[in-house]
UniProtKB/Swiss-Prot annotation:
This is N-acetylmuramic acid 6-phosphate phosphatase. It comes from Pseudomonas putida (strain ATCC 47054 / DSM 6125 / CFBP 8728 / NCIMB 11950 / KT2440). Keywords: Antibiotic resistance, Carbohydrate metabolism, Cell shape, Cell wall biogenesis/degradation, Hydrolase, Magnesium, Metal-binding, Peptidoglycan synthesis. NCBIfam families: HAD-SF-IA-v1, HAD-SF-IA-v3, PRK13222.1-3. The keyword Flavoprotein does not apply.
């Protein structure tokens, strides 16, 4: 079936949002007189959300007293500064332009709450260009459940087999596969050191956004 749309996970796939997460964690540590942590430690757990990032930055058990207050502070700060340093990954602007020139639709399916995802898309000038934005607010079950991808395909009125879903986490590939879409795993994203995208069962694995050009071209011609 001919490819009709390309859907992306947000953090670590479409956008490099790590700089904003890292800046907030380091600021919270500094304000408490605590030493900075290696940025890569935070980057490696971004897919685990605020809970994982705060736990890593503060080397703290999520069940410990005071942890929830730190997590809520992190989210409050991120609400205010969620699009200060975030940007498209290198090569992604060109890829999106190619997708649009090819008359394909593209959109975002993320586990990031809409209160964060929408401002970022708007700030980066992507909201008007994308065909849709699916967040946990729109479904009962988030990825790895297939519901977000099923909703995306229904919203676009497309057969899942004509959709490619791109992500940097096993949950993305599981969600897409169970929804019936084609899947692509990216190695340039926020991969936990113990994870190996080659083992996720994706249809294809790439190291750079522009490598998706070949994947898309192949899907368009049915090669």
């Amino acid at each position: 079936m001919r490819l009709r749309a390309v859907l992306f996970d947000m953090d670590g796939t479409l956008l490099d949002t790590a700089p904003d997460f890292i800046a907030i964690c380091q600021a919270m540590l500094a304000e408490r007189g605590l030493p900075a942590v290696d940025d890569n430690l935070i980057r490696g757990v971004i897919s685990g959300g605020a809970r994982a990032m705060v736990a890593t930055a503060f080397a703290m058990d999520p069940e410990a007293d005071g942890f929830e207050a730190l997590r809520l502070e992190f989210l409050e700060r991120y609400q205010r500064d969620c699009a200060v340093h975030s940007k498209l990954f290198e090569g992604m602007a060109e890829l999106l332009a190619d997708i649009e020139k090819g008359n394909l639709l593209w959109g975002v399916v993320t586990n990031k709450p809409v209160r964060f995802a929408e401002p970022i898309m708007q700030q980066l000038g992507l909201a008007e260009r994308s065909a849709l934005l699916i967040c946990p607010d729109h479904v009962k079950n988030s990825k790895p459940d297939p519901e977000p991808l099923i909703l995306a395909c229904k919203t676009l009125n497309l057969d899942p087999a004509s959709v490619l879903f791109v992500g940097d986490d096993l949950r993305d590939i599981e969600s897409g596969r169970d929804a019936g879409t084609r899947t692509a795993a990216v190695r340039y994203g926020y991969i936990h050191p113990e994870d190996n995208p080659n083992n996720w069962g994706a249809d294809v694995v790439v190291d750079h956004p522009l490598e998706l050009r070949k994947v898309i071209d192949s899907a368009l011609c049915g090669c």
